[in-house]
Amino acid sequence: MSSSKKESRNNAKNFIKNFSENLYPNSNRVYLNNSDKSIKVPVRSVELNRTEIIDNNNKIKYEENSPVMIYDTSGPYGDPKSLIDMKSGLNKLRNKWIIDRKDVELISKNLNLENKNNNFKKNIDHYISKKNRCITQLYYAKSGIITKEMEFVSIRENMNYEYSESEAKNNKKITPEFVRKEVASGRAIIPSNINHPESEPMVIGRNFFVKINANIGNSSISSSIEEEVQKLIWSVKWGADTVMDLSTGRNIHETREWILRNSPVPIGTVPIYQALEKANGIVENLNWKIFKKTLLEQAEQGVDYFTIHAGLLLRYIPMTSNRLTGIVSRGGSIIAKWCLFHHKENFIYENFEEICKICSCYDISLSLGDGLRPGSIKDANDEAQFAELYTLGKLTKVAWNYNVQVMIEGPGHVPINMIKENMTKQLKYCHEAPFYTLGPLTTDIAPGYDHFTSGIGAALIGWYGCAMLCYVTPKEHLGLPNKEDVKQGLIAYKIAAHAADIAKGHHISQIRDDAISKARFEFRWEDQFNLSIDPNTARSFHDETLPKSSGKNFHFCSMCGPKFCSMKISQEVRDFAKNKKIIDGMNKMSEIFKKNNNKMSLKK
């Protein structure tokens, strides 16, 4: 092991031992309850300072500012009172809910026992649905049953904010019944494998907050288990709603076990990667038997959603021959090579119903992968891309017949003027199943800055109705992202998702914006920092030029200085206008102006 790799691994080990870094000063962990207090939903509450008001008598008064609630994905890592032992894993939040429904049983022969080298202190029970019982959130929703997961989600999406009577009537308040209807219709999913009880329920659908996925995972030449667990914790602290483990290197199974047992968010995988490892890296040796065993192992382990490239058909492959960048999806290229070598139809497509049966036994959601997504803006919206999308729509109906939850994956590289067509066709072809896109990147000229190029596309497609955005880091096209890259990618995508929520008119999305704008106008610097998406960076930028604590009391920053601050001048104008005599005089002059037919009368 090289010295740099050893150093990275040791840094990750130290991070895991001391992961209590405070990313959000002046924030408290708050739990919101349902009516019988059987559910505790975590949110982050940002405490704000009072507003200083000078009345007409030149006396100082104070006005309280309510705390701002912020959606929190950090799970126990965001609660300073939590005692976490990585080798034991997180508490099983959903275990009682799952068992109380009385439709699961312990797995008699656990395939995961073949992988004993996981170093966990506790034996993990693994479940499967009882014979002739369906346990998916989609089945419950279609049956009119509101699950604890649905109730949890409704509280999480509302965060106890008050709604006006008209907003409540217009379905802006997200009730458990609203969640149930969205899941039942297929417009939303709640990824929740019964063998991942550590996860906190979340919903993916266009009528909810836009969600963010972070990709982590090792490669054959980089990273360790410790570094991937570090990235997991870092991801959820910075706001990842789900995490995909895309490991392609050594110890795939053990890496995933550590990630699952310590993850408060749903975990997705691309099973073909591990299946290829089982085939010794030789694509031609892949077959349905290997792939099925891989699915079962991951199902029993607790993976919440599978990305499978079932829509890439043999007859679509020639459509890519004139592309500038060919097939850029790793899973897609594997399937394409297998199909061409054997001159057979995609074995995932051929066995799709069997896959649905497996998923329904564990409540695993399917993320139908876009193996023919464009890898450059020149290839965007071509025949191959939309042929696959049309097939994914057909497969969606098949999965729904087995009560399996489905979302659809999308591009990729798409110029701004072609983005909306992707959303329009996805809704039409795929029956309004949630859309989950990688960006899209809107230009190909910025390696090292593709979190910007893709953030532009992500904000737009989120506005148009995309339910979840897969982040892109600065390392896209260049290398495996490290901890700092993960942070930068997540920040870019949290901004894009938030901008999309505002554009969609999500009722509570703008509360944070209004609070920070009010703090900015009132020169409450600490509140500005604490409400921002990255408080420590905002504070450090301010302190580069005004480092003293007294600088937090100034009514200006170093951009404009004390004499040219527009907000300071605006405040002075507002205070000046509060004088009743001035207002009366201005109103009087306004009436004179109107009587003179809107003409000025100048007296010498």
Curated annotation (Swiss-Prot):
- Record's cofactor remark: Binds 1 [4Fe-4S] cluster per subunit. The cluster is coordinated with 3 cysteines and an exchangeable S-adenosyl-L-methionine.
Give the top-rank taxon of the lineage listed in the UniProt record for this protein: Bacteria
Instruction: List, separated by semicolons, the cofactors it needs.
Output: [4Fe-4S] cluster
Per its UniProt entry, what is the enzyme's top EC class, as one word?
A: lyase
The EC number on file is 4.1.99.17
Assembly and partners are described as: Homodimer.
Q: What is this protein called?
A: Phosphomethylpyrimidine synthase
Species assigned in the record: Wigglesworthia glossinidia brevipalpis
Q: Which gene encodes it?
A: thiC
